[in-house]
């Protein structure tokens, strides 16, 4: 390493964000970048580890530990420290097709497994990664790389989220003719409509990369829902292989009285609507909008946070977020040792913004909704909540148990359900004759990504279930490699 004592000499530093009161006035990204000297100092904090844990991804205790795409983190940290930015970019692109996505929206399990993080703040890997790729775009180093020759084989990639885009780029660079079939009106899947613009800019970040893929020769077809207006069997006939990257899009519902009232929406419907409105699609009168309303978000994950941030920008009157789990500790608990992902209390951007306006953290823990109450017009006007505790049942499972006498009424004219996803939509797998697993995801081998139908592969959330963007990119790359091997008998793809 260029600076073996950097972790002793420099403290962790991350860029300042725009203030909550300022950034809620628009939908622009709110993270700043560090200057070059500061970035080089941060890269110098990367230790000369005997056994680095940051760069090797694995599932551990229900979460991710290390980098799922196996980024060469110690190598590009050292190159940044030495000012060799172009070489750092080359190392970064060896393993990650889209570091501008992960550098913005990844929760950074690499930092959770950083060796320095055992007893000090970890290296700011995520920020360094994003700085490398943005430097690459600024300098003109990120250019289309079309294949020199074509194999004559045609591959359909269904879905243009992170898994689909990674699979498409890898297969195209192997020389295959790739068509991406996307049912929405724009590319990106989750990247376009599932993540708000202030976290991932649609024009300056997502479409910038899409344009590169198009220039490399990848064809995108929009408003193409395979199994509906685009026949599944026609796709099988027209292409030599298919890679399914359709995501885990079936939302977990709230089966309580009043669920059918107007004003109760799934989080993804709300987030999609907000982005479409921002991009100028659809009549404003049809929007799901939070302006002037008492908003309740049910669910405490990243999607819930995105709903909070979006509602703040739309001008909600009040905002409350209910979480059925207990409040995490401020430091790792004994049953959450390094290098597991640290399950600790944090305040994300949406909660910061709500606290700045309303003077309190919007989250209420160990709380669930018992029923929704409507007005004479059939619109939700309030909900009834109850506090819960967690107990072990006869089967040894941890289950929530209501606490008597803790019912409360909460005003709400907009209720957003952000409780995760239960699996992939089943119509397309059924049309193709593909087996599903016990979790209602597409059954595909964890090494070969092959489904029960020869020539059809599956990657990303539709195979592994709800997960991270970085896992989706890793799976898209893996499925592309195995698809290329199936088509050609061997492969040079990583």
Report each predicted region and the residues it spans:
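Beta1-alpha1 glycine-rich phosphate/pyrophosphate-binding loop at the start
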Residues: 5-32, 41-44, 57, 70-80, ...
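C-terminal catalytic lobe of FAD-dependent flavoproteins
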Residues: 12-13, 17-37, 42-45, 50, ...
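Ferredoxin-type iron-sulfur electron-transfer modules in oxidoreductases and energy-metabolism complexes
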Residues: 24-41, 64-65, 69-104, 108, ...
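Feature captures the FAD/FMN-dependent oxidoreductase FAD-binding
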Residues: 87, 149, 154-158, 210-256, ...
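Glycine-rich dinucleotide-binding loop and its adjacent helix/turn
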Residues: 131-149, 206, 211-228, 251-314, ...
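FAD-site-proximal beta/loop scaffold in flavoenzymes
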Residues: 260-292, 391-466
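A conserved FAD-binding loop/helix module that cradles the flavin
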Residues: 304-309, 314, 459-493
């Amino acid at each position: 390493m260029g600076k073996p004592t950097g972790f002793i000499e420099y403290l962790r530093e991350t860029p300042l964000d725009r203030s909550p009161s300022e950034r809620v006035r628009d939908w622009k990204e709110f993270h700043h970048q560090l200057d070059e000297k500061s970035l080089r100092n941060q890269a110098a904090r990367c230790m000369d580890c005997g056994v680095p844990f940051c760069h090797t991804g694995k599932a551990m205790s229900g979460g991710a530990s290390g980098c799922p795409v196996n980024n060469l983190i110690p190598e590009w940290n050292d190159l940044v420290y030495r000012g060799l930015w172009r070489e750092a970019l080359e190392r970064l692109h060896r393993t990650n097709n889209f570091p501008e996505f992960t550098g913005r929206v990844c929760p950074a399990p690499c930092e959770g497994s950083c060796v320095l993080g055992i007893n000090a703040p970890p290296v700011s890997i995520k920020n360094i990664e994003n700085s490398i790729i943005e430097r690459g775009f600024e300098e003109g180093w990120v250019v289309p790389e079309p294949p020199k020759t074509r194999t004559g084989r045609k591959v359909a990639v269904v879905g243009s989220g992170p898994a689909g885009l990674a699979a498409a780029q890898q297969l195209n660079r192997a020389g295959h003719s790739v068509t991406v079939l996307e049912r929405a009106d724009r590319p990106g899947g989750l990247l376009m409509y599932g993540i708000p613009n202030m976290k991932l800019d649609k024009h300056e970040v997502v479409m910038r990369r899409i344009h590169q893929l198009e220039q490399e020769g990848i064809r995108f077809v929009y408003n193409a829902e395979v199994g509906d207006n685009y026949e599944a069997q026609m796709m099988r006939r027209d292409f030599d292989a298919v890679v399914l990257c359709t995501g885990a899009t079936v939302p977990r519902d709230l089966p309580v009285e009043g669920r059918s009232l107007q004003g109760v929406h799934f989080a993804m419907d709300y987030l999609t609507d907000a982005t479409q409105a921002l991009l100028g699609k659809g009549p404003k009168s049809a929007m799901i909008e939070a302006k002037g309303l008492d908003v309740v978000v049910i669910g405490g994950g990243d999607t819930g946070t995105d709903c909070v941030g979006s509602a703040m920008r739309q001008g909600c009157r009040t905002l409350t977020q209910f979480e059925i789990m207990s409040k995490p500790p401020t430091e790792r608990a004994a049953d959450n040792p390094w290098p597991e992902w640290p399950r600790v209390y944090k305040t994300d951007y949406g909660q910061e913004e709500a606290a700045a306006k309303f003077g309190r953290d919007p989250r209420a823990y160990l709380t669930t909704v018992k029923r929704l109450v409507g007005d004479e017009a059939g619109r939700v006007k309030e909900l009834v909540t109850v506090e819960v505790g967690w107990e072990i049942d006869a089967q040894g499972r941890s289950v929530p148990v209501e606490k008597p006498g803790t019912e409360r009424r909460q005003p709400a004219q907009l209720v957003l359900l952000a409780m995760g996803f239960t699996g992939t939509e089943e119509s397309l797998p059924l049309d193709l004759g593909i087996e599903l697993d016990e979790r209602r995801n597409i059954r595909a081998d964890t090494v070969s990504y092959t489904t029960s139908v020869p020539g059809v592969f599956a990657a990303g959330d539709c195979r592994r279930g709800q997960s991270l963007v970085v896992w989706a990119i890793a799976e898209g790359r893996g499925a592309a490699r195995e698809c290329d091997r199936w088509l050609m008998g061997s492969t040079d793809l990583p």
